[in-house]
């Protein structure tokens, strides 16, 4: 027992469980919904194997059941299974709806992160372009040799220097200081990098504000990312 290798991460624990209970867990592809109370079954069957502790098993289960492929498998008509793959009852509507919302929120977070990364890339590219387009220092022209003239020449009027175009005024936004003052249906904006996306308030929760973007996607946003 002392010579058993130790599993250091939740992913390694999941891989071990998929090998130990292939009819219940899977390392890839769509996952099957697990029996309610399966944690206690795991403790009784594998605690001590591979030096596994209850904390490691609990963390691995949490990671497994919050993964996209597991949430995809929680759908109407699906059946829960125990460690040996035996059916343990059909999923109820409440659990299916909860999984759908979790998956939707996870996708929204990924999309918001990608939008923020794209905004930063565009900002960096624009800054690099401005440096390349900066005008080089003009050389002063050499004065032309004077010619002897019998009549005085009238000096040409110098053209006024062209005014540099004004930089576009950056749109100003007011931060949302108190989310409890927000109302359902109120319009505001969600900050993503230097951009602000139009959104509508759907719900005010303890974790933040659920909003809907113009694209139809809904997500929960913290107060510091909301502006008017």
Swiss-Prot record:
Q: Where is the composition biased (Basic and acidic residues)?
A: 117-136, 146-173
One BP annotation, GO: post-transcriptional regulation of gene expression
A GO CC term?
cytosol
Molecular functions per Gene Ontology:
RNA strand annealing activity; RNA strand-exchange activity
Where's it found, cell-wise?
Cytoplasm
Say if the entry is tagged with keyword Transcription regulation. no
Output the Pfam families linked to this UniProt entry: ProQ (PF04352), ProQ_C (PF17516)
Q: Which UniProt keywords apply?
A: Chaperone, Cytoplasm, RNA-binding
Its chief place of residence is cytoplasm
Ranges for region Disordered = 105-178
InterPro entries hit by this protein: ProQ, ProQ/FinO, ProQ/FinO_sf, ProQ_C
Function text: RNA chaperone with significant RNA binding, RNA strand exchange and RNA duplexing activities. May regulate ProP activity through an RNA-based, post-transcriptional mechanism.
Member of which family?
Belongs to the ProQ family.
HAMAP family per record: ProQ
By what name is this protein known?
RNA chaperone ProQ
Q: Which organism is it from?
A: Citrobacter koseri (strain ATCC BAA-895 / CDC 4225-83 / SGSC4696)
